[in-house]
Structure formats: C-alpha cells, structure tokens
C-alpha cells in the first residue's frame, strides 16, 4: 500500500476502472439510442417522464424529434451533461431489469469489494454517469455477488460533487463525509490521469488504473503516478 497507510475510504471511477470502457461506448450508449424513440412515444406526456424531458433546454424539449436530435448530437460528442445522464439512466433501467444489460466487471473487482468491506474500508463511487445509472450498474453485474450495492457506502456524480478533473470536486466529496476528515486516508482509483491529479491536489492518495482498452499512458504519466493493472495489487 502507499506510504500514507491503508485507506479508510476507496473512491472508485467506473469506466476503464471497474469495467471496460467499451461497455459504455459499445453497449450502454447504443442501447439508450435504440430505446429512445419508443420510450418517447410511450412516455412523452406522462407525469413520471416530465422530470427527464423538462430538464432539457426548452428548445430541445419542444418535440420528440427535437429531443432525439439533441440527444444524438450530445452522445456523438460524448458530452457529459447532467440532463443527458439522467435520461440515459432512465433508458437503461428497463434493460438492466430485464436482464438484457449486465455490467461486465473485471474479474478482480467483486472479490476486492468483499475484501475491502470485510476489512472495514468504505467503498464509494464517483462517476460522470448519474447516481441513478451508477446504482443500476452495480446492482446488475456479472460478478459474485452480482449485486454490489450493499458493499457501497455512497455515490457521487457531476451534480452532487462537480467535474471530475477539478480538485474542488474531491474536496466536496471529502466534506460530505466528515467522519473521514483526513484526505490522505482516501484512495481514489481511475484510468484518467487528469482525475488522478485532481484527487491528489485535494490531498487524496490516487493511483492510475491501467486496464485493457484504456488510453495509452505516457512515460511521464508512469513516472508521476503509481499505475496498477488490477485491484489485487492494492
């Protein structure tokens, strides 16, 4: 473990850290797009859907066609904006519940969750995906146990914490848990070097996770940060 000692809290990214980036890009995103037209047709005027529709800018929520076009544009550019993330979570929910969607965790993830929890360490999640989408993913995995929600203490996204590449977001997360006041008792794991740097600026320990399919790390990245290939190295 790092010189600061065993962490009390392990804060985890999702894409490229606990599951392949390809799951989001090649499975979840296409599923949302394919489910969108029928969902809008069936739910457009229903009260339970209005919170998702009305969160969009007015010009894009004026019709089903306008909203669909805006969603396609945002997703083609991988824009991480809260109202899109909320709608995606809503669209994915039926797929997870039907069993059509199941999160393919890396083999070391579920066993390590159980190990961390038994050791008294808290597990928390910080992802650009909405908290609702995070909970769906961890409730429906290919791991053992398949439902990892009981192992997780809290969830953060860009709404309740802020942008993932800003140190202030990690300070917000720290402030949400005054029972763990020492920043260096937190360990943040992510495939994104800029996120790791932001967490370190906030005082957390942070490692870069190198998984199959992730972006190539530079020699400078490897020199500046501890890089792990599996949670078993922690």
Curated annotation (Swiss-Prot):
Entry's localization field: Cytoplasm; Nucleus
InterPro entries for this protein: Enolase-ppase_E1 (IPR023943), ENOPH1_eukaryotes (IPR027511), HAD-like_sf (IPR036412), HAD_sf (IPR023214)
Signal peptide (residue range): none
One GO term describing the cellular component: nucleus
Catalytic activity as recorded in UniProt: 5-methylsulfanyl-2,3-dioxopentyl phosphate + H2O = 1,2-dihydroxy-5-(methylsulfanyl)pent-1-en-3-one + phosphate
Residues that hold Mg(2+) according to the record: 13, 15, 191
A GO BP entry: L-methionine salvage from methylthioadenosine
Entry EC no(s): 3.1.3.77
Pathway this chain belongs to: Amino-acid biosynthesis; L-methionine biosynthesis via salvage pathway; L-methionine from S-methyl-5-thio-alpha-D-ribose 1-phosphate: step 3/6; Amino-acid biosynthesis; L-methionine biosynthesis via salvage pathway; L-methionine from S-methyl-5-thio-alpha-D-ribose 1-phosphate: step 4/6
Cofactor(s) required for function per UniProt: Mg(2+)
HAMAP family: Salvage_MtnC_euk
Stated family: Belongs to the HAD-like hydrolase superfamily. MasA/MtnC family.
Functional note: Bifunctional enzyme that catalyzes the enolization of 2,3-diketo-5-methylthiopentyl-1-phosphate (DK-MTP-1-P) into the intermediate 2-hydroxy-3-keto-5-methylthiopentenyl-1-phosphate (HK-MTPenyl-1-P), which is then dephosphorylated to form the acireductone 1,2-dihydroxy-3-keto-5-methylthiopentene (DHK-MTPene).
Subunit structure comment from the entry: Monomer.
UniProt-recorded name of the protein: Enolase-phosphatase E1
Organism of provenance: Podospora anserina (strain S / ATCC MYA-4624 / DSM 980 / FGSC 10383)
Gene label: UTR4
């Amino acid at each position: 473990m790092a010189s600061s000692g065993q962490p009390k809290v392990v804060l985890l990214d999702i894409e490229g850290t606990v599951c392949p980036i390809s799951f989001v890009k090649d499975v979840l995103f296409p599923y949302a797009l394919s489910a969108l037209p029928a969902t809008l047709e069936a739910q457009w005027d229903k009260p339970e859907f209005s919170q998702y529709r009305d969160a969009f800018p007015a010009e894009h929520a004026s019709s089903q066609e306008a909203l669909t076009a805006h969603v396609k544009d945002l997703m083609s550019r991988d824009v991480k904006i809260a109202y899109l993330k909320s709608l995606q979570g809503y669209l994915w929910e039926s797929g997870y519940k039907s069993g059509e969607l199941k999160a393919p965790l890396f083999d070391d993830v579920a066993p390590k969750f159980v190990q961390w929890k038994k050791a008294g360490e808290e597990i928390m999640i910080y992802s650009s995906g909405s908290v609702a989408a995070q909970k769906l993913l961890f409730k429906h995995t290919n791991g053992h146990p398949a439902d990892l929600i009981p192992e997780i203490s809290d969830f953060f996204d860009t709404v309740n914490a802020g942008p993932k590449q800003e140190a202030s977001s990690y300070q917000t997360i720290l402030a949400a848990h005054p029972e763990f006041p020492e920043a260096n008792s937190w360990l943040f794991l992510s495939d994104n070097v800029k996120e790791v740097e932001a967490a370190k600026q906030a005082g957390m320990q942070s490692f870069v996770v190198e998984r199959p399919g992730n972006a190539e790390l530079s020699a400078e990245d490897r020199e500046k940060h501890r890089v792990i290939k599996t949670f078993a190295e922690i």
